[in-house]
Amino acid sequence: MGAADGPVHLPTEYSHYEGAVARTFDLPLLILAQDNLMRRVVFDPNFGPYMGKFPENAGKQWLNGKDFKVAFGHWREAMGNRRDFFLGYCGAAAKTARQLRDFLEKQLDATVLDWQRDFKYSRSIIEEIEEARVRCSAGIFLFTKDDLMSKPDSGRQAAPRDNVVFEAGYFCAAKDKKRVLIIRELGAKMPADLGGDIYASLDDRRNLTVVKQSLRKFVSGF
């Protein structure tokens, strides 16, 4: 294409396709645009992340310049904030959650976003949950016997805390059921909409041995 100040280049359609996929999955993006490249779709400044620019004749020395370092710095910071799993649970089950987090981090080499340890007090919980959706690849939720039911069914004497159920459902919708593992304590009510094969049974919240194999299998999928 001709222009008064020189040619204007169109990026390959694969750049737009791959950028859209990355955006859909909330992956950190490092976008570098050549000068005179038409600024549209992925290469539009309003697409999202900071965009670096480079001249058509850029050599290796460009990597030492400000344009690259600033763009790379934004991307590296976003990557550093990524976690493998969000861990959701009721505060009353904090001891069990710490055991679970230690197993994930120390034995399975996974990175965990633990709301009690990692959330900022200056922000609302819903803001933190929304950010957790972006930062984490999947979610693990503890459904424990938190709230006694007025008319308990046989063997189901309590329900998980409402906010934990909400968070699990939110992650199922945002990430897909395959990216959510629910660890259900024996006797805790399981919401019908979240039933099926996405949970592991925990007989005793003080002993995680029975669910470790399910955790290994779940973690190995990411």
For the regions a language model picked out, list residue spans one by one.
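Positions that flank functional sites
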Residues: 37-38, 120, 148, 190
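Conserved N-terminal substructure of TIR/SEFIR domains
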Residues: 74-141, 174, 186
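Conserved beta-strand termini and adjacent loop/short-helix elements that scaffold enzyme active sites
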Residues: 32, 115-117, 183, 202
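C-terminal interaction surface of TIR/SEFIR-family domains
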Residues: 38-98, 189-222
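Short His-Asn-centered micro-motif
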Residues: 11, 32-34, 89, 142, ...
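Gly/Pro- and small hydrophobic-enriched strand-loop and loop-to-helix capping segments
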Residues: 23-53, 175-187
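Short glycine-/polar-rich loops that comprise or flank the Walker A/P-loop
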Residues: 25-29, 108, 136-138, 176-179, ...
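TIR-domain catalytic/interaction hotspot
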Residues: 1-20, 117-173
